[in-house]
């Protein structure tokens, strides 16, 4: 069964499907706003059972959270938005905010949850929505493709000179502005969304060779920037986003198949080459005879080897590269349905890479599966919205599709990595 979207197929969609875009669902009710607010309040009670301190901190954040849920929910309902999607996003937000306050109490995080940053991000999202119409119009012009490239390169340059790592892993993905820590690599992901939306909406979409060339240049720019700031975690999300966007929106052709397979093969060959080089260069590294030029790429080779070898056998280095994965394994085993009751809190970076493990450890597997349900719900509804809007609002649908896929990748790669299923979590180099 074909799941990609061809331009020829778009022209053949009948009028009944087009009418579906405009007709709201029968159960697309404003009751979803009430459900979301009730969940936010109920989760505060659950937090109180775990930690009164975390619950009172959550109570302070609950006021702007409930108000924003009501306001944004009303706007979404009046604009005939998907209220089920809105409800799922609100529930995930409440879980995330409450978890951060619980982590601040139970663990020793490098950085604590900031209500100020939460309010600033909320205001920025409002400003973004206000100007999104102008941005959307600009994406139809070819110059926006190069503008997104330039913005991404500028972000990497800023991080190279001014970036630092509050966790002490040696990456340069964060900057500090008057005491507020920002991870600028998140903005490169937003640029990627706009880049692909513009690429498949402007005049270049008619030329497959041009699309592959420009997308490859953008892909290599992100790879080079990620290596420059010693941070591959965000790049892996951009890597999968790159392949998914081309698979879905580039018309099916032999050239497309060859390109995607070539990228996959090159990726696997790079990992295999890293293993070979690690075995070959390890003696010279131990003897201190490694040439200076080779020593510059040695950290990359060693990190890739460590991540894959530790995933294969977590006990190879239990007090080094495998330490946080070993602690995560213990936390998951002791979590139970309702959370850890033996006070095991030796979990590194619980506020970032190990957030899902911390959620299961403190709140139990029931909450963990609830979060996974909301994540799948958001993903399915986002993809459904894309399918409904792709004919008449192509650029908007591409942005929604990209944001949905990127949110899913961001969450699932970290979750599977922290559970030692994928060797991708914690890949600073």
Roles of regions detected by a PLM:
Residues 2-25:
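Short, Lys/Arg-rich, polar N-terminal cytosolic tail immediately upstream
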Residues 23-62, 69-230, 236, 415-429:
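Membrane-helix boundary/helix-loop-helix interface segments in multi-pass membrane proteins
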Residues 61-65, 119-127, 189, 361-382:
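Hydrophobic alpha-helical transmembrane segments
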Residues 65-72, 126-129, 241-250, 268:
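Alpha-helical transmembrane segments and their membrane-interface exit regions
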Residues 208-227, 232-296:
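Hydrophobic alpha-helical segments of polytopic membrane proteins
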Residues 258-367:
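Hydrophobic, glycine- and aromatic-enriched re-entrant/interface helices and adjoining loop segments
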Residues 365-413:
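Hydrophobic transmembrane alpha-helices and their immediate junctions
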């Amino acid at each position: 069964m074909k799941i990609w979207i061809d331009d020829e197929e778009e022209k053949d969609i009948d009028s009944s499907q087009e009418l579906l875009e405009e007709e709201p669902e029968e159960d697309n009710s404003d009751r979803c706003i009430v459900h979301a607010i009730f969940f936010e309040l109920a989760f505060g009670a659950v937090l109180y059972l775990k930690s009164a301190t975390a619950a009172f901190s959550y109570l302070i954040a609950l006021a702007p959270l409930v108000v924003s849920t009501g306001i944004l929910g009303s706007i979404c309902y009046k604009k005939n938005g998907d209220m089920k999607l809105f409800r799922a996003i609100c529930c995930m937000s409440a879980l995330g905010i409450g978890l951060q306050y619980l982590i601040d109490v139970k663990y020793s995080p490098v950085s604590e949850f900031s209500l100020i940053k939460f309010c600033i991000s909320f205001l920025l999202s409002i400003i973004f929505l206000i100007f999104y119409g102008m941005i959307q119009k600009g994406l139809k012009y070819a110059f926006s493709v190069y503008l997104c490239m330039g913005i991404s390169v500028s972000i990497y340059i800023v991080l190279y000179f001014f970036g630092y790592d509050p966790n002490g892993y040696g990456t340069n993905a964060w900057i500090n502005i008057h005491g507020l820590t920002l991870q600028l690599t998140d903005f490169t992901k937003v640029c990627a969304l706009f880049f692909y939306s513009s690429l498949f909406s402007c005049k270049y979409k008619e030329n497959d060779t041009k699309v592959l060339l420009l997308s490859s240049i953008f892909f290599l720019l992100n790879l080079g920037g990620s290596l420059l700031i010693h941070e591959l975690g965000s790049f892996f999300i951009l890597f999968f986003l790159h392949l998914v966007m081309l698979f879905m929106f580039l018309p099916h052709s032999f050239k497309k198949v060859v390109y995607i397979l070539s990228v996959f093969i090159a990726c696997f060959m790079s990992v295999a080459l890293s293993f070979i080089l690690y075995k070959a260069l390890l003696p010279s590294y131990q003897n201190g005879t490694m040439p200076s030029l080779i020593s510059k790429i040695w950290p990359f080779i060693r990190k890739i080897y460590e991540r894959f070898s530790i995933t294969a056998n977590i006990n190879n280095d239990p007090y080094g590269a495998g330490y946080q994965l070993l602690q995560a394994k213990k936390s998951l085993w002791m979590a139970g349905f309702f959370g850890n009751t033996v006070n095991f809190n030796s979990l590194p970076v619980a506020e970032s890479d190990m957030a899902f493990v911390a959620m299961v450890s403190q709140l139990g597997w029931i909450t963990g599966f609830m979060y996974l349900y909301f994540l799948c719900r958001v993903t399915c509804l986002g993809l459904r919205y894309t399918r409904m809007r792709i004919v008449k609002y192509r650029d908007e649908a591409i942005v929604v599709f990209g944001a949905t896929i990127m949110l899913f990748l961001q969450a699932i790669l970290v979750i599977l990595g922290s559970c030692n299923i994928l060797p991708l979590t914690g890949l600073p180099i």
